Amino acid sequence: MSKQPENSFSSDKFFPIKQKLALEAVALVEPGMCVGLGSGSTAREFILALGDRVRTERLVITAVASSRISQLLAEAVGIPLLDHSLLQDVDLVVDGADEVDPCLRMIKGGGGALFREKILLQSGKRNVILVDERKLVPTLGKFSLPIEIAPFGCSSVQRILNKQGYFGEWRETSAGERFITDNGNYIYDVRTPDSYANPEEDMIRLLQIRGIIDVGFVIAKAEVWVGYADGSIVRKKEHNEY
């Protein structure tokens, strides 16, 4: 069984880079905006920075959180949240990613919120993905590919995945229990194959399997902001070799 990735936050040596990326991104927020809040350690820093602006500048905005964890943090720092069932257009979505290839295709879902994160990105007028340089890869697949699967018939879905050449493990919590997403589903972390030259094809193939809710590939219009150890930030908007 695969374990749910643990948050390290300030113990991460790239923590200052995540903070800098978050501060750069929060400057994009303008009064009256609806802001999509991603999940994960970098999105956490963005939420904290946005909360500071709401508090110190009396910034009037609304936000939609992609996970229960992000929702609780946003509430704690005073960010007004929109009922997610009322979600329509989102002016700005800020999130992170687990991997980004040279075509800006991504793998997301290390925190288990991939389905809601992708709905936010689909609704976003402007999507900004914040990553540090470790997340840049020549080909997707170094990080496991999360697949969100409905509990009903999940063993059958796993059997079909294995027959098609996708092998992995069911994600567990640190307590050794089956990880359950905010939507009440499971996560199957695919380890093999470990390289996806054409993720669009894999995504189409996987989504045809009944019981699969969503796949961790993200092929969406988004800006990717990359933070480097030297303190620089590079903003990528289209195919760009590293």
Swiss-Prot record:
Its EC number is 5.3.1.6. The active site is at residue 117. Substrate binds at residues 39-42, 95-98, 108-111, 135. It catalyses: aldehydo-D-ribose 5-phosphate = D-ribulose 5-phosphate. Pathway: Carbohydrate degradation; pentose phosphate pathway; D-ribose 5-phosphate from D-ribulose 5-phosphate (non-oxidative stage): step 1/1. One of its GO terms (molecular function) is ribose-5-phosphate isomerase activity. GO terms for biological process: pentose-phosphate shunt, non-oxidative branch. It is an enzyme of class 5 (isomerase). Keywords: Isomerase. The keyword Protein biosynthesis does not apply. The keyword Isomerase applies. InterPro entries: NagB/RpiA_transferase-like, Ribose-5P_isomerase, Ribose5P_isomerase_typA_subgr, Ribose5P_isomerase_type_A. Catalyzes the reversible conversion of ribose-5-phosphate to ribulose 5-phosphate. Homodimer. Belongs to the ribose 5-phosphate isomerase family. This is Ribose-5-phosphate isomerase A. It comes from Chlamydia trachomatis serovar L2 (strain ATCC VR-902B / DSM 19102 / 434/Bu). The lineage of its organism: Bacteria, Pseudomonadati, Chlamydiota, Chlamydiia, Chlamydiales.
